Amino acid sequence: MKKKDNGKRVRFFIVYLLIYSYCMKKLKIGFTYDAKADYKLKPGESPDKIAEFDSEETLSEIEYSLKTSGHIIERIGNVHSLLKKVAQGKRWDLVFNIAEGIKGRNRESQVPAILELFDIPYSGSDALTMGATLDKAVAKIIVSNSGILTPKFLEIEDLSQLNKKKFHLKYPVIVKPSEEGTSKGIAQESIAHDFEHVRKRTKWLIEKYKQPALIEEFIIGSEFTVAVIENDPPLVLPPVQIAINNKTFLGENFYKHSCVFDDSIKYICPAEIPKSLDKKLRETSYNSYKALGIRDLGRFDFRVDKDNNPYFLECNPLPNLGLIDVFPLVSKAIGITYEEVICKILNSAIKRYGLDYTDF
């Protein structure tokens, strides 16, 4: 009798699963991105141009994670591919966007602007926020007006604006492109201790990147990055401390893109820091997220001085989501998988639009 009852229960459970699978709501999710393989550098072009773009390995990791949500995932590709598909009448319930764009200071705004134009929901921040955060000077002004500490700075569009007598920043300073990410244009030579070095580096940056140079007081100390996801309320993930050559007090050293390739960089999460500093970093990240109008995900970079004061450096609303970056570390620190973090970002956007779906 027991065997018959068990058999009935198994059959009932199988039928239940089949009915549930048939009835549950699945969304059609588009996936926009910039792949390194889609762009061929012309002779003389710097690898910097595609430094922010993703490898096929990273794209596959994200795509797999999105598929674990149970929704239907369709690769779209870059902004040009998106335009073609939209012109052909293609539509999606929502687009998961990590596209960086290829040209101009509004490049990160291109995909969000197109999707808004065609009334297609998408993950991440809108075009206005993308533009504001790509311009480091604008982002610093916004957070500063919200009471958040950020190093004093100058933005120089033309070398004639640099005047030794009127130069009020304290040395050392760091000179970097105002409208770039992935540490483009930043090297140890970016640190300057005198005006002539500032002038030389500023001239080089303006000529190479065809954009303003940001000259900023350099905070001697340690370096952190903090990821934030979701919206109501935002979920601030554990701070990640950056160690270079096994040192957490970096002095005048700092994160550079070259560190990734020479294996000198190490991410420490959870960071081995006082609770008071952990709290400051989380609160400052939360407040920056709100002040800049970030949605669904963002990452914030800080320098921390000898008195444990965190200084906002920049915000990346399109942080690298691959396994080589900080997201696997922070997901492990809060007891969830990398795939679950990606799905949290997706579900955050879905809920923000009030889309009808089944939360798997």
Sequence positions of predicted segments:
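Polybasic, lysine-rich low-complexity intrinsically disordered segments
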Residues: K2-K4
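Short acidic/His/Gly/Ser-rich catalytic and metal-binding motifs that mark active-site loops
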Residues: D38-K42, G181-S183, I324
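Phosphate-binding site of ATP-dependent enzymes
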Residues: V95, F195-S276, K280-E283, K306-Y311
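ATP-dependent carboxylate activation and anion-phosphoryl transfer catalytic cores
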Residues: S144-G147, P274-F360
